[in-house]
């Protein structure tokens, strides 16, 4: 369901999106004193060389997030660019891809497209791309794995915060729980939220209006928790 964000909602640590990267983790690799265990001898470097095959797997996953606005009729003019989803892991192990147990909230940009046909109905759509390490305490993606979340923190919910701008200059952030969508596609996918704009009253006044923006004061740069 859709809830209006209130100031007393618990906001987890705030992060920007991680860059996309991949890693390989070959197992059971040993240093041997038997030349027969190597592939060839490098005459120039004077060392025995063994080729190691490794499959690069993603350590960062991509979600495409779309907020479908039905019955807008020009009421909502855009988003503020401070869209965020909470409940994602704040770090990962580069070798194993196993994510940590520290939930965070990740920001991403959204842009508005108007008069788009969605499931046979015309709507405005606010959409954006989100990159994340995935959910907390989660195994990495492998080709044979399923996308359903099997980690140890299913109680950590995911909330989508969408700051909306209205035609009278006011703003309001709505909150939608997207836990089921995130846990059913924990290695990335498409998150879709449908909103009937006729059920959202336009805030009175002008300018900032009645708005909750999930940010913090006295911001300082924080490094991601990435284990080697």
Can you say where each PLM-predicted feature lies in the sequence?
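Tryptophan-paired
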Residues: 1, 76-184
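A short, Gly/Thr-enriched small/hydrophobic beta-strand-prone motif that recurs across taxa
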Residues: 55-70
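N-terminal compositionally biased, intrinsically disordered segments and leader/signal-like regions
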Residues: 13, 174-176, 193
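Hydrophobic, glycine-enriched assembly/anchoring segments
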Residues: 187-228
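Primarily extracytoplasmic ectodomains and periplasmic/lumenal surface modules that are beta-strand-rich
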Residues: 72-74
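Residues at beta-strand starts and edge strands
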Residues: 48-50, 59-63, 79, 156-160, ...
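Short, low-hydrophobicity acidic/polar segments
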Residues: 1-59
